[in-house]
Amino acid sequence: MKRPLRIFCALLLAHTLRAHSAEPPATLTAEPFPLPGGEGGIGLDDLTFAPGLRQVLVPAGRTGRLDLIDPGTRKLREIGGFKESAPEGGGHGAGTTSVDEGRGYLFAIDRTALRLSVVDPRKGTIVAGAPLGGSPDYARFVAATNEVWVTEPDKDGIEIFALSKADPPVPTHAAFLAVPGGPESLVIDTLAKRAYANLWKSSTVSIDLAARKVVQTWRNGCEGPRGLALDAQGRRLFVGCAEGGATVLDLAHGATLKDSLRFGSGTDIVAYNPALRHLYVPSSKSGQMAIVSVSAQGKLSQIGTVNTAFGAHCAVADDHKQVWICDPRGGRLLVVRDTLP
């Protein structure tokens, strides 16, 4: 090939690559999914996917119910017994707002009653419980220690409940773990036997599950860290930033900041689908959600955008390539089928 032609081909290829990289993200559509009692709004917060039940868990706040949704059929089942209240016009300070799965049971908080409840999903009822020492935020089951950890940000710490070996398990207060300056969010890393939580400003802490103490503090690249999502096999921790967007920490290399992405404003609870390697980043103040591809090296690239709703600050991924997004003001969920590569 002659030199001028080689130069022309190289320039053409470079232009093509630049044009490809500059392509705008695809736009996906969200479908509304009404919740019972949603008229007037529901203070939704912590949505989770229970792999054992293969259901999306929706603690439906002031309605006094925990909603379980089959992502395949989209059938909804309600479990009552939590405190009910009238629409509060914003916030998520009433009823049940966080839940986790463990030992075949569900462990849910009740902000109004200040209780940790044990729910039998087969019977559809609350079967045990214990009083909380403070206002709760997140509940997480810790299989390695047979405990439930409940964050209490107003007390700057985590209340730890030991579970009996009985069936159903009965929770008993066991300890209080101080997390000064936090905790916000909570994820359990079973492989590393660690828990991760954010501080309200710029940092994430690593907690030894057995020792029940903070062992490391990492800068996470956010001004206001909020939600966390764990890629356990990929050894990555994603952090949602209140200023808008997310960052990724490389857990295999000292939790170094691997990459960051800015999107909108008012990001809170992010979600991750490890099969697709997609991160979901809601922007509550713009009423949108970014779909972000995570490369094998941990680099973040926005590949999609979803129009959601103002105030939609939380998301969870299921095992059907769907994302469920909370719409607190609408008292409903929004569902997106992720068809992106």
Where do the language-model regions lie?
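Sec-dependent signal peptide recognition
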Residues: 2-10, 18
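Predominantly soluble domains enriched in secretory-pathway, periplasmic, or organellar proteins
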Residues: 20-341
